[in-house]
């Protein structure tokens, strides 16, 4: 989102901070949405290997999708915990 500097200069500090917060929130929302789409695509390609015949996944596909999502979330939580530990000064 590019806003001309001349337009930004017209805003007071409160409005500038509010705009920065809005842009930050929208950027974060887009990242989460992008990760969700990537996860869905990855797990779908891994788990749904046969033609779709009904409006529901079969039991094997449903279990595979659930496991795939859980694994993704577990890995992300582990990585986030490790990064937080590193930023706090710990190396293990």
UniProtKB/Swiss-Prot annotation:
Source organism of this protein record: Neurospora crassa (strain ATCC 24698 / 74-OR23-1A / CBS 708.71 / DSM 1257 / FGSC 987)
One Pfam family of this chain: zf-Tim10_DDP
Keyword terms: Chaperone, Disulfide bond, Membrane, Metal-binding, Mitochondrion, Mitochondrion inner membrane, Protein transport, Translocation, Transport, Zinc
Protein name per UniProt: Mitochondrial import inner membrane translocase subunit tim8
Highest taxon of the lineage: Eukaryota
Encoding gene per record: tim8
Keyword Iron applies: no
SUPFAM superfamilies per UniProt: Tim10-like
Topology term for the membrane: Peripheral membrane protein
């Amino acid at each position: 989102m590019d806003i001309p500097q001349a337009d930004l200069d017209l805003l007071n500090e409160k409005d500038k901070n509010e705009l920065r917060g809005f842009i930050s929130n929208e950027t974060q929302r887009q990242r989460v949405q992008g990760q969700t789409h990537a996860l869905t695509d990855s797990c779908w390609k891994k788990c749904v290997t046969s033609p779709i015949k009904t409006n529901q996944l079969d039991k094997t596909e449903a279990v595979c999708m659930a496991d795939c999502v859980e694994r993704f979330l577990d890995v992300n939580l582990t990585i986030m915990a490790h990064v937080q530990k590193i930023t706090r000064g710990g190396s293990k």
